[in-house]
């Protein structure tokens, strides 16, 4: 028998809640869905991913760090051999959050930024978003997080 018995990665829109209003948002994020999974239900999903042998989950949204239980879900996932990748606008990564993220195993972060300049980025993502994303990257670097990714949407 050859091949994989489970997907390598599963993408999970953890929340639709978002503090930005990006012009290009694919999920029409903004407000939290009232039917959003509870923490315990999220743990159940992770249990199933572990049972199936999924290598990692890509948490998106919305802004996944808006969930009050975000760190609980990430910890539960990595404690159950399900690695985590997540995309963030960076606004919730302060020095403390960066240190907490740097202390975790099996974690990959992608910070979204949409322009080489503040003017270009903020036109797409909203005022102050460029500075927030840059600050998040600085906090991650200062916390010795290691390599992280930067996601850029390019348009003509």
Task: Give the location of each predicted region.
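Radical SAM/AdoMet-radical enzyme domain recognition
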Residues: 36-59, 67-156
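Catalytic metal- and UDP-sugar-binding loop of GT-A-like glycosyltransferases, i.e.
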Residues: 12, 59-60
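Canonical Radical SAM [4Fe-4S] cluster-binding loop centered on the CxxxCxxC motif
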Residues: 3-40
């Amino acid at each position: 028998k050859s091949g994989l018995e489970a997907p390598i990665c599963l993408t999970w829109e953890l929340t639709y809640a978002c503090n930005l209003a990006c012009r290009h948002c694919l999920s029409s994020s903004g407000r939290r869905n009232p039917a959003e999974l509870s923490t315990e239900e999220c743990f159940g999903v992770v249990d199933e991913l572990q049972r199936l042998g999924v290598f990692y989950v890509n948490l998106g949204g919305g802004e996944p760090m808006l969930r009050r239980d975000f760190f609980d879900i990430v910890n539960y996932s990595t404690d159950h051999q399900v690695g985590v990748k997540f995309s963030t606008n960076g606004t919730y990564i302060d020095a403390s959050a960066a240190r907490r993220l740097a202390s975790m195993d099996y974690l990959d972060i992608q910070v979204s930024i949409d322009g080489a300049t503040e003017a270009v980025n903020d036109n797409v993502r909203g005022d102050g978003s460029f500075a927030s994303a840059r600050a998040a990257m600085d906090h991650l670097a200062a916390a010795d997080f290691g390599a992280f990714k930067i996601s850029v949407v390019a348009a003509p």
